[in-house]
């Protein structure tokens, strides 16, 4: 909750330092390794938001860690014990999370490849296909929206107006389709995901509806899209988004 609202505080650094304190307490007092791992990641995120990248590397290390297939081992063990439903759920959740990690990681790398248009375009195409095939706009709309915005930003940096506009069209269309209150849940394919989300994660969005709507609109009006300021289609997109979010113009 602190991480989701720290930017709204008059003293954001104080809030982030509080996050660090809470994470340290979990690491010192908990015997649950999963909680400890989550605390380490959240503490590192708080440091990154404070502009402390060197400290983040000290906490997490500087290299990619090898994934040893823990989830597959646990699922196989459950199956050997006759716990078929548990095994299926673990594999579904693992597949869902790895699919999202692929999209999020690819999205994060986009702006690092702006000077390499061939690689940039290929990444965009591959992630677009993943989003479509895995129904990501319904499963985890934030992952899809973040990708569309990052892709649009990269295209704008390359001064490619048509491609920038296309990504913003996808962004706007997805925003308009959002059903509030925003929740996380599975679908017909990930049919065991919803129960896991209810057990392990709060399915409700961590921020209130009006804050989400305000940010959805503000994100479509970033300075990065200055090259479209006089474009009629872009102006129409923004007006349409304002209408569907039932918001007045954000100053």
Model-predicted regions and their roles:
Residues 24, 41-45, 61, 72-76, ...:
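Amphipathic alpha-helical repeat scaffolds
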Residues 30-40, 63-73, 97-109, 140-148, ...:
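Generic helix N-cap/helix-start motif at coil->alpha-helix transitions
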Residues 4-9, 42, 46-47, 77-78, ...:
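Residue-level signature for tetratricopeptide repeat
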Residues 37-69, 163, 231, 238-251:
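A short, hydrophobic/aromatic-rich structural module that often spans a beta strand
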Residues 102-231, 235-236, 240-251:
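Alpha-helical protein-protein interaction modules
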Residues 12-28, 51-64, 84-97, 118-135, ...:
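Alpha-helical repeat scaffolds
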Residues 2-26, 205-209, 213, 219:
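Short coil/linker segments at helix-helix boundaries
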Residues 3, 7-11, 32-33, 47, ...:
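Short, charge-rich amphipathic alpha-helical segments embedded
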